[in-house]
């Protein structure tokens, strides 16, 4: 099993992946709140376990009308922005990932459970990127998710 530092280094060292992450982030971040809500809705559609883990948010089907869900969605997107901003520095990426992981460890989210976000992220990327969507972009994001998984 790879360590956080090893996986962070693999992402930081891969210029092609970093380009794909930054390009797709440019699209995703145009509407931070909307994209975050879409990502969470896609997660809840694909995972009943996720709905259970997020019970504290209340009625997630209310979408934008649920202030707790909105808050989580916005916070999630700014965490992703921190990851993107740290793509050129292994130590910085490791630090922001480990801080992000603490929140999930405290809520008893396992690495495998966290990895379930890749499918909903793929759906979100496809919806947001349209004809610019490709599987290489999903793979780049999956590599970033793997860094978080290693920290859990």
Curated annotation (Swiss-Prot):
Alphabetized UniProt keyword annotations: Acetylation, Heme, Iron, Metal-binding, Oxygen transport, Transport
Superkingdom per UniProt: Eukaryota
Residue sites binding heme b per the record: 72, 104
One Pfam family, short name: Globin
Residues the record lists as N-acetylserine modifications: 2
Matches recorded under CDD domains: Mb-like
GO molecular function, one term: heme binding
UniProt KW Metal-binding keyword: yes
Location of the Globin domain: 12-152
Family note: Belongs to the globin family.
Name of this chain's protein: Globin-1 subunit beta
